[in-house]
Amino acid sequence: MPMVRVATNLPNEKVPVDFEIRLTDLLARSMGKPRERIAVEIAAGARLVHGATHDPVTVISIKSIGAVSAEDNIRNTAAITEFCGKELGLPKDKVVITFHDLPPATVGFNGTTVAEANKK
């Protein structure tokens, strides 16, 4: 169940209308997770600096139960960075991604935790 937050200092009108849908599809393929379980939040127009400049940048946080091993992160970083380059016009050094592996007991969904739902 990946939960993704994309913060960028680009204004909302510079982010394609269906960006989050296409990012969901990319993550489903790259992470091997069903698209129905992926949540993507876009925070365009964020007051965000990288390297002490206001140059266009995106900072992405991906929280997931699994699919965030060292090998997974290399593959996913390459795919997401390429996607952001094409869709947002960002150079590779302006796409910053963090990956967080979540224990199933720390994720609530459908009225219970994922750990509890997995017991059934």
Swiss-Prot record:
Belongs to the MIF family. It comes from the Eukaryota. PROSITE patterns: MIF (PS01158). Pfam families: MIF. GO terms for molecular function: cytokine activity; phenylpyruvate tautomerase activity. GO terms for cellular component: extracellular space. SUPFAM superfamilies: Tautomerase/MIF (SSF55331). Transmembrane segments: none annotated. This is MIF-like protein mif-2.
